[in-house]
């Protein structure tokens, strides 16, 4: 198992729509383990494959962060949604920034699990918000796409400066 490099906004890979997974196999399961390792290392509760540069429709979630309730969603699809909610969301690809994002309060999502079996989750509250946030990533949307252009541009400018500083410190 290994920790993967998290892609930082405004990297173009975060704007790409991810491809469906066509085969659930040992290689994919190793990647999923690496995604969980990365998510825990970075202190997140959810991670989309595109956030580590892999443009496949795979999500890992662990709301509690204690490794006892890990959720894997492969090729997730929201079937139903209702209600309105929102919290200040953060993102591993945009460290240090948060914004209020409108979301559906309850959702029903269909996906494959890591064994390739179809699963259905009826999610609400933080679990529903996290699923929607990560599915946005699979569709090339980051949470700052939900805020004003001015705020988004400020964050983009600051993130580009941060990326340059990180690049210089590694050189």
Curated annotation (Swiss-Prot):
Binds 1 Fe(2+) ion. The keyword Protease does not apply. CDD domains: Pep_deformylase (cd00487). Pfam families: Pep_deformylase (PF01327). It comes from the Bacteria. Transmembrane segments: none annotated. GO terms for molecular function: metal ion binding; peptide deformylase activity. Belongs to the polypeptide deformylase family. It is an enzyme of class 3 (hydrolase). Fe cation binds at residues 91, 133, 137. One of its GO terms (biological process) is co-translational protein modification. It catalyses: N-terminal N-formyl-L-methionyl-[peptide] + H2O = N-terminal L-methionyl-[peptide] + formate. The active site is at residue 134. This is Peptide deformylase. Removes the formyl group from the N-terminal Met of newly synthesized proteins. Requires at least a dipeptide for an efficient rate of reaction. N-terminal L-methionine is a prerequisite for activity but the enzyme has broad specificity at other positions. The lineage of its organism: Bacteria, Pseudomonadati, Pseudomonadota, Gammaproteobacteria, Pasteurellales. Its cofactor is Fe(2+).
């Amino acid at each position: 198992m290994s920790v993967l490099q998290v892609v930082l906004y405004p990297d173009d890979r975060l704007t790409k729509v991810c491809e469906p997974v066509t085969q659930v196999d040992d290689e994919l399961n190793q990647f999923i383990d690496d995604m969980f390792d990365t998510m825990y290392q970075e202190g997140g509760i959810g991670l989309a494959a595109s956030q580590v540069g892999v443009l496949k429709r795979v999500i890992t979630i662990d709301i509690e962060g204690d490794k006892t309730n890990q959720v894997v969603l492969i090729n997730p699809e929201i079937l139903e949604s209702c209600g309105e909610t929102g919290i200040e969301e953060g993102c591993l690809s945009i460290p240090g920034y948060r914004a209020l994002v409108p979301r559906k309060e309850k959702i029903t999502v269909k996906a494959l699990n890591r064994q390739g079996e179809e699963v259905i989750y009826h999610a609400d509250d933080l679990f529903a918000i996290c699923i929607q946030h990560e599915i946005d990533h699979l569709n090339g949307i980051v949470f700052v796409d939900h805020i004003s252009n001015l705020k988004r541009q400020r964050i983009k400018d600051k993130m580009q400066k941060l990326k340059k500083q990180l690049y210089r410190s590694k050189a």
